[in-house]
């Protein structure tokens, strides 16, 4: 079912630009008004004779009852008001629609003609004659009230948030969030330093957007014996990806409405997936690479010299998210919305019903925004399929998360079991992997 605020465009033309292609909101708003509210009394100059009758669109003979009209429509409106006549249309009330003059060789629908007189703004109080019946007086008052209501409506400031405002507002918010947390991932830790904090220290801590603000960084460099320089490492960027995802979660509205235990549960479930899609999108969008690559240029994945054949197979499987991103040519807006949907997952087990409702409400906003964006950019034909394809990426992320946890446990139980010395990525990494 489509969201309430979505209007499906009629075009099916595909547009790959991340810019929003939004319909003319003035036209949509005008079409959405009831016919009785389309009336707007025009301020007309009495110095010139109008060209066309506002009712039948034939030549006008002057201003009659404040509206440019012909003698026939003037007389019809006057007689209808004086007699208090009410008419019924048998053809969907569209007999006088269009822009061409009405065919006078055929009998004109009286109901549509009278409605057109009222919409054009003919003023019943300008009729200088006594009402013939009580019905006439009632009809005159009814028309005057309807027209006054319409004028009041048109003169009242309307505070209307269109779906354009909704979409652009949410996308703008996510863009700001991404710009804030991206340096946490792309900048990396200072060479030779490690973040030794654990998950429980991070969850309820204030938002940190710079590594200068991280307390108690531990300096423990891995030095190359030949050159004496600190060895480049991709491991710190894995930690940085997880850290950026956790800090990212603190900027959502739900973060201030749920308890610490619920935050921990949600973070344990979503951090790996958020970090994976961030790494994949960075490799594709920033590095233009068809392999997962860290910001320092090193390829992602366990080193072959230590993990052997198992590591090689796992490294190949890690590319699935990137391959999916490449196949769908994900743009930045789609990436941001998809990552927000991944994080805001109310279906995580052990969350209370009240917490699920809070998270679910926020997730619904991002799902609706993504659907709206797809419909507006890809049209009513390709939009729904694009939306479905983007959501299908979530199943790839969930599969990748399971594979990552399985490989981590396998490596600790077998490959690294008898290792004399190996460097753990971080306490945070191990806690997330083993959760």
Curated annotation (Swiss-Prot):
<dbReference type="InterPro" id="IPR000536">
    <property type="entry name" value="Nucl_hrmn_rcpt_lig-bd"/>
</dbReference>
<dbReference type="GO" id="GO:0008270">
    <property type="term" value="F:zinc ion binding"/>
</dbReference>
<comment type="function">
    <text>Orphan nuclear receptor.</text>
</comment>
<feature type="zinc finger region" description="NR C4-type">
    <location>
        <begin position="89"/>
        <end position="112"/>
    </location>
</feature>
<keyword id="KW-0804">Transcription</keyword>
<dbReference type="GO" id="GO:0005634">
    <property type="term" value="C:nucleus"/>
</dbReference>
<keyword id="KW-0805">Transcription regulation</keyword>
<keyword id="KW-0539">Nucleus</keyword>
<dbReference type="Pfam" id="PF00105">
    <property type="entry name" value="zf-C4"/>
</dbReference>
<dbReference type="GO" id="GO:0004879">
    <property type="term" value="F:nuclear receptor activity"/>
</dbReference>
<dbReference type="InterPro" id="IPR050274">
    <property type="entry name" value="Nuclear_hormone_rcpt_NR2"/>
</dbReference>
<dbReference type="Pfam" id="PF00104">
    <property type="entry name" value="Hormone_recep"/>
</dbReference>
<protein>
    <recommendedName>
        <fullName>Nuclear hormone receptor family member nhr-136</fullName>
    </recommendedName>
</protein>
<keyword id="KW-0479">Metal-binding</keyword>
<dbReference type="InterPro" id="IPR001628">
    <property type="entry name" value="Znf_hrmn_rcpt"/>
</dbReference>
<dbReference type="GO" id="GO:0006357">
    <property type="term" value="P:regulation of transcription by RNA polymerase II"/>
</dbReference>
<dbReference type="GO" id="GO:0000978">
    <property type="term" value="F:RNA polymerase II cis-regulatory region sequence-specific DNA binding"/>
</dbReference>
<dbReference type="InterPro" id="IPR013088">
    <property type="entry name" value="Znf_NHR/GATA"/>
</dbReference>
<keyword id="KW-0238">DNA-binding</keyword>
<keyword id="KW-0675">Receptor</keyword>
<feature type="zinc finger region" description="NR C4-type">
    <location>
        <begin position="53"/>
        <end position="73"/>
    </location>
</feature>
<comment type="similarity">
    <text>Belongs to the nuclear hormone receptor family.</text>
</comment>
<dbReference type="GO" id="GO:0030154">
    <property type="term" value="P:cell differentiation"/>
</dbReference>
<keyword id="KW-0862">Zinc</keyword>
<dbReference type="InterPro" id="IPR049636">
    <property type="entry name" value="HNF4-like_DBD"/>
</dbReference>
<feature type="domain" description="NR LBD">
    <location>
        <begin position="194"/>
        <end position="430"/>
    </location>
</feature>
<feature type="DNA-binding region" description="Nuclear receptor">
    <location>
        <begin position="50"/>
        <end position="129"/>
    </location>
</feature>
<keyword id="KW-0863">Zinc-finger</keyword>
<dbReference type="InterPro" id="IPR035500">
    <property type="entry name" value="NHR-like_dom_sf"/>
</dbReference>
<dbReference type="GO" id="GO:0042594">
    <property type="term" value="P:response to starvation"/>
</dbReference>
């Amino acid at each position: 079912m489509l969201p309430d605020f979505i209007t499906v465009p009629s075009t099916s033309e595909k547009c790959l630009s991340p810019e929003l292609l939004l319909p003319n909101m003035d036209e949509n708003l005008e079409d959405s008004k009831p016919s009785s509210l389309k009336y707007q009394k025009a301020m007309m100059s009495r110095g010139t004779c109008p060209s066309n009758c506002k009712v039948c669109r034939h030549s006008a003979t002057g201003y009659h009852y404040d509206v440019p009209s012909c003698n026939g429509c003037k007389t019809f409106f006057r007689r209808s008001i004086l007699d208090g006549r009410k008419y019924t249309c048998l053809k969907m009330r569209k007999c006088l629609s269009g822009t061409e003059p009405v065919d006078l060789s055929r009998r004109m629908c009286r109901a549509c003609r009278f409605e057109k007189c009222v919409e054009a703004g003919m003023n019943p109080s300008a009729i200088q004659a006594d009402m013939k019946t009580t019905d006439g007086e009632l009809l005159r008052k009814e028309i005057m009230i309807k027209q006054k209501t319409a004028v009041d409506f048109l003169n009242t400031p309307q505070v209307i948030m269109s779906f354009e405002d909704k979409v652009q507002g949410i996308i703008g918010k996510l863009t700001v969030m991404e710009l804030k947390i991206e340096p946490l991932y792309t900048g990396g830790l200072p060479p030779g330093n490690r973040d030794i904090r654990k998950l429980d220290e991070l969850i309820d801590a204030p938002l940190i957007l710079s590594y200068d603000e991280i307390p108690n960084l531990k300096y423990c460099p891995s030095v190359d014996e030949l050159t004496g320089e600190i060895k480049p490492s991709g491991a710190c960027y894995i930690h940085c990806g997880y850290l950026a995802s956790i800090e990212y979660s603190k900027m959502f509205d739900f973060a201030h409405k749920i308890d610490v235990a619920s935050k921990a549960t949600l973070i344990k479930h979503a951090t790996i997936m958020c970090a994976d899609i961030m790494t994949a999108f960075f490799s594709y969008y920033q590095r233009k690479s068809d392999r997962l690559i860290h910001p320092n240029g090193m390829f992602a994945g366990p080193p072959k010299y230590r993990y052997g054949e198992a590591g090689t197979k796992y490294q190949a499987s890690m590319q699935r998210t990137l391959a999916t991103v490449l196949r769908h040519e994900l743009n930045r807006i789609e990436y941001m919305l998809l990552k927000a949907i991944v994080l805001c997952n109310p279906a995580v087990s052990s969350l209370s019903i009240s917490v699920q409702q809070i998270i679910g409400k926020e997730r619904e906003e991002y799902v609706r925004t993504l659907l709206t964006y797809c419909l507006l950019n890809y049209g009513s034909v390709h939009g729904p399929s694009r939306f479905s394809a983007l959501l299908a990426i979530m199943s790839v992320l969930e599969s990748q998360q399971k594979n990552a946890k399985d490989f981590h446990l396998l490596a600790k139980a077998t490959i690294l079991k008898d290792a004399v010395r190996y460097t753990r990525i971080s306490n945070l990494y191990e806690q997330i992997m083993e959760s």
